[in-house]
Amino acid sequence: MASSTALICDTEAWKDLKGHVEDIKKTHLRDLMSDANRCQSMMMEFDGLLLDYSRQRATVETMDKLLNLAKASQLTEKISRMFNGEHINSTENRSVLHVALRAPKDAVIKADGMNVVPEVWNVLDKIKEFSDKIRSGSWVGATGKPLKDVIAIGIGGSFLGPLFVHTALQTDPEALESAKGRQLRFLANIDPVDVARNISGLNPETTLVVVVSKTFTTAETMLNARTLREWITAALGASAVAKHMVAVSTNLALVEKFGIDPNNAFAFWDWVGGRYSVCSAVGVLPLSLQYGFSMVEKFLKGASSIDQHFQSTPFEKNIPVLLGLLSVWNVSFLGYPARAILPYSQALEKFAPHIQQVSMESNGKGVSIDGLPLPFETGEIDFGEPGTNGQHSFYQLIHQGRVIPCDFIGIVKSQQPVYLKGEVVSNHDELMSNFFAQPDALAYGKTPEQLQKENVSENLIPHKTFSGNRPSLSLLLPELTAYNVGQLLAIYEHRVAVQGFVWGINSFDQWGVELGKVLATQVRKQLHSSRTQGTAPEGFNYSTTTLLKRYLETSSEPQM
């Protein structure tokens, strides 16, 4: 299907929603929430998950109009094109097939006419075999000791996604048992402090390093890889590198040149974007080393269950589609630029940072997929913290400052339940009391009249008034197992894609990260010249020159 040069904002469906905004401005969530039929229609269940979006500033009519917008944007066709392996990442001429990474063995998903699923499972089987060897102790380090500690080196999607999943599983009873005696750490930043923190307390003799870089040229990752190679070599000799370092890469020549056995390189493909790569060897290898492949396979099955739901469910009952349309409504029509992701689960503390990248790198675009400047805003500013920590941090602004739509994520069954004798409720019930209360506090607020009835002094009434009418949605998961973690990941991945499909942008490239890299190269050359030859900074503006001079004059870096 050829792309259309028309912008979505030129369609009747978009204009209809623009006019509808005036109707919504006349409503308040206090009134909308009193309509039980409306609320019931805004609850969706799938596979034990419950989505409640009744606290969105939307009516049944709004949802009908958003579904018309989906039709106008050719959303059905765009989803099909993604699953069919068409090159929907047009600026890089690539398919977008992260769904193939978690597809069942008998599935058929094609890229350039070839079924990629067998290739995916070849890598998964190789990961299972390798991780079993490491975990069983049949593969040992250079001094004959088992490798019980893993450092995964990667940046961006090679780090944020796997870290989110690792953190979510750390306290799951089954995962906890399977990881007994093992450690998994992630090294991302080129700041030497990150290196120091990662190797602190570790013995090179028992450490395996996983270097994640598709091209094996990523500047930050390769500098950290060389640093850890030096750490291993200094302790165990150069020959130990092949026993203590493996790669996730497709550049076997550079892998071998680095000192890693190419047989210990695990592939992934051009049709996997970095921020969508957690289900590839990028995430599956380090997670399998920590928890065992069978645990990670449950995670993949959870993600796959949402893939199938997304592909086959009518839009009015399709969780990622509904979430994506509501985000478009909040950003492009109601004018809310941000979104708070608020999981009431400490195990999900790294979820918001991961989705921040998935969302903002995907949809932070200013032109259409055809290169036309967009006359409307796309993307959201995503941030978040687990509840109840966030309540004591930034909820003040959410309640009485700017309006920020919120995603509340709750878990029915705690990974680590605690009930203290004499307490009114369990620790988890105390947490969930806040999960249920906060959305209503945002929706209903508190009026001056209510405060007067409570005999609040007149001078405090303006300060204690809550306007309410602040949108949120609630997603309730039955528990937080590897399967549920996979579901949660896929829901948000597809939600982000839906937003991009509707806006008519390319959610799968990231040219915005390139310019800074180019400028950093110029600075790097200057620093080298200044350190080795004493040359003064030149060719920069006054501000950068002044900053560079101060840095060079006062830094304690050794002369090279």
Swiss-Prot record:
CDD domains: SIS_PGI_1 (cd05015), SIS_PGI_2 (cd05016). The keyword Metal-binding does not apply. Keywords: Acetylation, Cytoplasm, Gluconeogenesis, Glycolysis, Isomerase. The active site is at E361, H392, K517. The modification N-acetylalanine is found at A2. Changing K105E: In strain: cv. Hiroshima. Changing L431F: In strain: cv. Pog-0. GO terms for molecular function: carbohydrate derivative binding; glucose-6-phosphate isomerase activity. Changing M114K: In strain: cv. Bl-1 and cv. In-0. Changing N198S: In strain: cv. Bus-1. It catalyses: alpha-D-glucose 6-phosphate = beta-D-fructose 6-phosphate. Inhibited by glycerol-3-P (G3P). It is found in: Cytoplasm. Changing S73A: In strain: cv. Bl-1 and cv. In-0. Its EC number is 5.3.1.9. It is an enzyme of class 5 (isomerase). Its main location: cytoplasm. Disulfide bonds: none annotated. One of its GO terms (cellular component) is plastid. SUPFAM superfamilies: SIS domain. GO terms for biological process: defense response to fungus; gluconeogenesis; glycolytic process. NCBIfam families: PRK00179.1. Belongs to the GPI family. Homodimer. This is Glucose-6-phosphate isomerase, cytosolic. It comes from Arabidopsis thaliana.
